């Protein structure tokens, strides 16, 4: 609701940019309920394999239930900082809307490159600060409204305050790279 549905378009473009071939392997970290995994499977005509890493067991269970018909997805309850997977296993590593929530970003990145095959691709989709002054002003005003909208729609503004604060405190694109 808060992104006005644009986050779905970003996820689809993310997979398009990834451009996975058939029979490729993806590890999707901070998978949530598996949106990226589902899009990856669709893009590879269900020939690609996906391992979803999700630290929240309730979220993982929702994803398993939602995508139970897709047999090419394996679910693992683990954190981004300690992935119980062998080295050099995946063609792609994805993390969408999750890297700003990890406990230790250096450990997360080390794990990412450990599980990627040589030549594998690290893919990160994340909210970040806006550098364009005109858009920045619009975004800042919208950010003030998001918790109010959240409180009106779901009766709780705290998750939306956290979202805005975590985006503001996180690295910008250049700092992350």
Predicted regions and their residues:
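A short SAM/SAH-binding and catalytic strip from SAM-dependent methyltransferases
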Residues: 91-105
């Amino acid at each position: 609701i808060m992104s006005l549905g644009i986050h779905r378009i970003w996820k689809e473009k993310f997979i398009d940019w990834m451009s996975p071939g058939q029979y490729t392997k993806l590890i999707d970290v901070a998978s949530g309920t598996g949106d990226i995994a589902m899009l990856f499977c669709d893009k590879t005509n269900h020939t690609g394999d996906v391992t979803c890493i999700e630290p929240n067991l309730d979220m993982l269970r929702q994803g398993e239930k939602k995508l139970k018909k897709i047999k090419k997805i394996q679910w693992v309850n683990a954190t981004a900082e300690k992935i119980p997977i062998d080295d050099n296993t995946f063609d792609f590593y994805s993390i969408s809307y999750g890297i700003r929530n990890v406990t230790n970003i250096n450990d997360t990145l080390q794990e990412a490159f450990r599980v990627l095959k040589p030549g594998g691709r690290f893919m990160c989709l994340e909210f970040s600060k806006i550098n364009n002054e005109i858009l920045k002003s619009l975004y800042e005003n919208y950010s003030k409204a998001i918790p109010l909208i959240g409180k009106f729609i779901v009766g709780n503004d705290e998750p939306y305050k956290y979202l805005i604060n975590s985006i503001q405190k996180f690295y910008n694109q250049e700092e992350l790279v």
